Amino acid sequence: MEAENHTTVAELIILGLTEDPKLCIVFFVIFLGVYIITLVGNISIITLIRISSQLHTPMYLFLSHLAFVDIVFSTSVSVIMLMELLGHGLVLSVATCAAQLCMTVSFGSAECFLLAAMAYDRYVAICSPLLYSTLMSSRVCFLLLGISYVGGFVNGWTFTGCVLSLSFCGPTQINHFFCDFSPLLKVSCSDVSIIGIIPSISSGSIIVVTVFVIAVSYIYILITILKMRSTEGRHKAFSTCTSHLTAVTLFYGTITVIYVMPKSSYSTEQNKVISLFYTVVIPMLNPLIYSLRNRDVKDALRKAIVRVYS
């Protein structure tokens, strides 16, 4: 009934990270640099994997798709955030806001599935090395990739459908730096008792399923490693899993807070900081996490540099 006493609006004002003009300039320079590093790092990973025959394995196939997902995921947020910092806020239509949220959620969810697929790949490689070529055949790899993207887009469409079913009557100022679901609910004049729960169930299901796959995979990996008699074998097995575990911990830790925990457990400013970390910072860190301690990537990079300058 309350919605009937207001005029429905079709535009939303995204306030951004700060309203301080001086801080806007500082943040613009910082996050433009972060975005450029993200693009260069992830494009370099994709290119290196494509041109290096020794990296044509399932693990690096998944890593190249993770890099692609990180590029789109970061771009869907960074471009809008940079425009806000330049213009001290940004006006978007509800449809544009919903489309941006769809991209962010879709590729963020796809990252969850890819991280689970990479954990399964490590499980097969360490626990069943003789069956690796069979269990991780091209058909299986592309099936896992298909599930990752389809599952991601289904979750994205769930969020989008919920947003498009909302009415916005004003005030339409969103205290965030991109169109995220929780801030949109706060400015809606619709009944959000059901709509607010559906995306949490959808995202929560993806997190629970993928975390279960990752946890079970690493439990079996740990058991197998502890049974190894060779110290060198243990070290090699651990080193192949360290980077992935680091990426998993960083990513799942932040998205769990945003999409699963009750919204009353953190403030709007804390929401901004956590969202900034998983949408902007983690996509920049992933290429470093997966390459700095990876001997195969270092060797492939060295050979690529030699080919270029020889």
UniProtKB/Swiss-Prot annotation:
Originating species: Mus musculus
Family assignment from sequence similarity: Belongs to the G-protein coupled receptor 1 family.
Keywords attached to this entry: Cell membrane, Disulfide bond, G-protein coupled receptor, Glycoprotein, Membrane, Olfaction, Receptor, Sensory transduction, Transducer, Transmembrane, Transmembrane helix
Glycan attachment points: N5
Compartment list: Cell membrane
One GO biological process term: G protein-coupled receptor signaling pathway
Membrane spanning stretches: 26-46, 55-75, 100-120, 134-154, 197-217, 238-258, 272-292
Extracellular-side positions: 1-25, 76-99, 155-196, 259-271
Gene Ontology annotations for the cellular component aspect, listed alphabetically: membrane; plasma membrane
Taxonomy of the source species: Eukaryota, Metazoa, Chordata, Craniata, Vertebrata
Pfam families in the record: 7tm_4
Coiled-coil residue windows: none
Protein name: Olfactory receptor 5P52
Gene Ontology MF: a single term: G protein-coupled receptor activity
Keyword Glycoprotein: yes
Disulfide bonds: C97-C189
Cytoplasmic membrane side: 47-54, 121-133, 218-237, 293-310
Membrane topology, from the record: Multi-pass membrane protein
Known role: Potential odorant receptor.
